[in-house]
């Protein structure tokens, strides 16, 4: 269900005093990536600035994403929290909104123990939506090791995928090895959470990416994925390296600061602003980003 190229959508904000949601801009971004051939949508992840949205805004963005997807491709909602009750609240809201699945970042800051993590994921999974575990230790302060992911997969039937952003290929291979022969209704999916590792992850048995770069160059990323799936590895590798400069530029500052400015430069949204405590991309880095983007026109 969640294989292929899935953009981690930005959440555009207006330039008014409250930085209100730019729903028209969100819809425009969604149509752009769908025209680019992506295989799904993720709303309200790290790239979508879920951390600085109210619950009402968070739910509105999920609803708008589900509506805009219009059953053409799956719509996934980021509903994770370091507070299990909040994760339950947002996951129930996602289910009510018609989301096809949820992405649950591992609880950050409070560093739960193993049994706490297992109980957290089981409790949220009991709501009934397909669950994608999100492992990003650089943001959460805690890695989810391969043996823990495998135990989750063995004991939570609707835990269907992991977004792996640890940067550790050995760990990813261990997850793939440990889950590929399990007796499940659907094969367990491992998707890359690092754009620079999408092709390497595919090459060791991964299934796609949840991508920042796909907000800006969905077509090229989908072409790379399709070439790999057709076993044209040399052509896929060429596409991969073509995208490297852009992928690096989109992380010249903390995500999603550069990608929102890139979307503004491309005319997808009116403003690339972000909410505090993040700050928008400055003039010098904006000029660098423009130069990189010009090579993809």
From Swiss-Prot:
What is catalyzed by this enzyme?
A: L-aspartate 4-semialdehyde + pyruvate = (2S,4S)-4-hydroxy-2,3,4,5-tetrahydrodipicolinate + H2O + H(+)
> Which residues constitute the catalytic centre?
134 (proton donor/acceptor), 163 (schiff-base intermediate with substrate)
- Would the keyword Cytoplasm turn up in this protein's UniProt record? yes
Q: Which GO terms describe its cellular component?
A: cytoplasm
Q: Where in the cell is it found?
A: Cytoplasm
**Residues engaged in binding pyruvate:** 47, 210
EC number(s) given by UniProt? 4.3.3.7
Pathway(s) per entry: Amino-acid biosynthesis; L-lysine biosynthesis via DAP pathway; (S)-tetrahydrodipicolinate from L-aspartate: step 3/4
- Which UniProt keyword terms apply here? Amino-acid biosynthesis, Cytoplasm, Diaminopimelate biosynthesis, Lyase, Lysine biosynthesis, Schiff base
| Biological process (GO), any one | lysine biosynthetic process via diaminopimelate
Record-annotated site: Part of a proton relay during catalysis: 46, 109
Q: Does Disulfide bond appear among the keywords?
A: no
Major subcellular site: cytoplasm
Q: What does this protein do?
A: Catalyzes the condensation of (S)-aspartate-beta-semialdehyde [(S)-ASA] and pyruvate to 4-hydroxy-tetrahydrodipicolinate (HTPA).
HAMAP family assigned to the protein according to its UniProt record, in alphabetical order = DapA
The molecule here is called 4-hydroxy-tetrahydrodipicolinate synthase
């Amino acid at each position: 269900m969640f294989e292929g190229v899935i953009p981690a959508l930005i959440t555009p904000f207006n330039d008014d005093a409250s930085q209100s949601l730019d729903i028209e801009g969100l819809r425009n971004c969604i149509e752009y990536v769908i025209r680019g051939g992506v295989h799904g949508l993720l709303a309200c992840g790290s790239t979508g600035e879920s951390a600085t949205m109210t619950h009402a805004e968070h739910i509105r963005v999920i609803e708008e994403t589900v509506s805009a997807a219009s059953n053409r491709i799956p719509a996934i909602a980021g509903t994770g929290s370091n507070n299990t009750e909040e994760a339950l609240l947002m996951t129930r809201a996602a289910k009510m909104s018609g989301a096809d699945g949820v992405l649950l970042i591992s609880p950050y800051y409070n560093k739960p123990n193993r049994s706490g993590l297992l109980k957290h994921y089981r409790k949220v999974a009991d709501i009934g939506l397909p669950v994608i575990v999100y492992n990003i230790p650089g943001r959460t302060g805690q890695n989810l090791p391969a043996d823990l992911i495998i135990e989750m997969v063995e004991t939570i039937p609707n835990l269907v995928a992991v977004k792996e952003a640890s940067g550790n290929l050995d760990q990813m291979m261990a997850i793939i090895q440990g889950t590929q022969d399990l007796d499940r209704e659907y094969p367990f999916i491992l998707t890359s959470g690092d754009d620079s590792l999408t092709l390497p992850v595919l090459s060791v048995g991964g299934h796609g990416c949840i991508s920042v770069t796909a907000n800006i160059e969905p077509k090229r990323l989908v072409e790379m994925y399709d070439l790999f799936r057709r076993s044209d590895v040399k052509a896929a590798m060429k596409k991969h390296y073509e995208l490297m400069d852009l992928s690096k530029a989109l992380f010249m500052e903390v995500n999603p600061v550069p990608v929102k400015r890139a979307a503004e430069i491309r005319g997808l949204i009116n403003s690339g602003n972000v909410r505090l405590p993040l700050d928008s991309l400055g003039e010098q880095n904006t000029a660098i980003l423009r130069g990189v983007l010009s090579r993809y026109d």
